[in-house]
């Protein structure tokens, strides 16, 4: 069970009938708890989201014996701003994100007819880029085609900056000193691993994500992650798998950073030739 404010999620991997019973019992216990404390339980807002292609999709019930109803099944659920779909490909979320960011981008361009980079780029960084990057550690396991849609919002915006219309995308980024979205995604992923490895987060909530192995400095940094084989290519794109090779290859001086800002600066310094690049082979 996970609780955030008034939002509660009960989840379980279903591999047997016993797992189904345990999940149903958890739902029943939660309902009984609300009744005991005289809390109103909104059955209409309670949904079941079945994850995975081979999910048996059992029915689950909510309520007491007198008013016990089958819980509705949803195919798309918004959780803390991220749209979750049954296949976890985040196609719907990425499309919605691109639509929202493009709308904001077009609003900026419509209201600022003088297309000076010193005006447009700060606006893009503060109003558009946060939309494109929100929750990307979660949803960046999408296909390269989907992720290109995110990059294209920045690509199209920079084409409107005065004086650099005819430059290639990467040259425009370098001229504007604006990192590619792909590069920032990679750095963002590495920053999350850094926070976990250096325990910036509560260790109890993150200790199960990675298995760090002790190594001597002659074989790279001392926070390398054990990589377990997976026979499903889809899983390799999830955060806990996709970051391993890149993280394990980081030089010791980058991983040795003591603060978040120091890590960012050292990472940028080490990869200064890639900051404005695309097609960095991270997602392949």
Model-assigned labels for residue ranges:
Residues 4-6, 34, 77-87, 101, ...:
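Short, conserved catalytic/metal-binding micro-motifs enriched in Asp/Glu and His
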Residues 8-32:
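Catalytic palm subdomain of template-directed nucleic-acid polymerases
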Residues 15-23, 88-96, 111-122, 140-150, ...:
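Conserved, non-catalytic sequence blocks in retroelement Pol enzymes and Pol-derived host proteins
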Residues 25, 39-76:
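Short, conserved micro-motifs composed of acidic
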Residues 31-49, 78, 146-215:
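Short, charged alpha-helical motifs in flexible N/C-terminal segments and linkers
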Residues 70-137:
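Basic, alpha-helical interaction scaffolds
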Residues 127-142, 191, 195-201:
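Extended, well-ordered alpha-helical segments in internal regulatory regions
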Residues 212-246:
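Low-complexity, glycine/alanine/valine/leucine- and proline-rich hydrophobic stretches
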């Amino acid at each position: 069970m996970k609780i955030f404010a008034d939002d509660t999620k009960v989840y379980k991997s279903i591999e047997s009938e016993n797992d189904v019973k345990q999940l149903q019992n958890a739902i029943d216990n939660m309902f009984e708890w609300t009744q005991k404390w005289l809390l109103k339980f909104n059955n209409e807002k309670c949904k079941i989201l079945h994850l995975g292609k081979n999910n048996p999709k059992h029915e689950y019930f909510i309520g007491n014996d007198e008013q016990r109803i089958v819980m509705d099944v949803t195919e798309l659920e918004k959780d803390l701003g991220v749209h979750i779909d049954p296949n976890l490909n985040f196609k719907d979320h990425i499309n919605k994100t691109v639509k929202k960011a493009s709308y904001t981008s077009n609003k900026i361009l419509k209201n600022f007819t003088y297309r000076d980079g010193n005006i447009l780029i700060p606006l893009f960084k503060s109003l558009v880029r946060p939309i494109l990057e929100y929750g990307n550690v979660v949803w960046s396991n999408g296909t390269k085609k989907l992720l290109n849609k995110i990059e294209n919002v920045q690509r199209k915006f920079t084409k409107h900056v005065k004086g650099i219309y005819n430059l290639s995308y990467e040259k425009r980024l370098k001229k504007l000193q604006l990192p590619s979205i792909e590069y920032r995604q990679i750095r963002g992923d590495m920053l999350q691993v850094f926070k976990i490895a250096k325990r910036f987060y509560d260790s109890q909530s993150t200790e199960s994500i990675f298995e760090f192995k002790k190594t001597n400095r002659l074989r790279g940094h001392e926070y390398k992650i054990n990589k377990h084989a997976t026979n499903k290519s889809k899983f390799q794109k999830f955060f806990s798998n996709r970051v391993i090779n890149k993280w394990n290859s980081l030089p010791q001086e980058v991983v040795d950073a003591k603060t978040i800002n120091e890590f960012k600066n050292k990472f940028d310094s080490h990869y200064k030739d890639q900051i404005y690049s695309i097609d960095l082979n991270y997602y392949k």
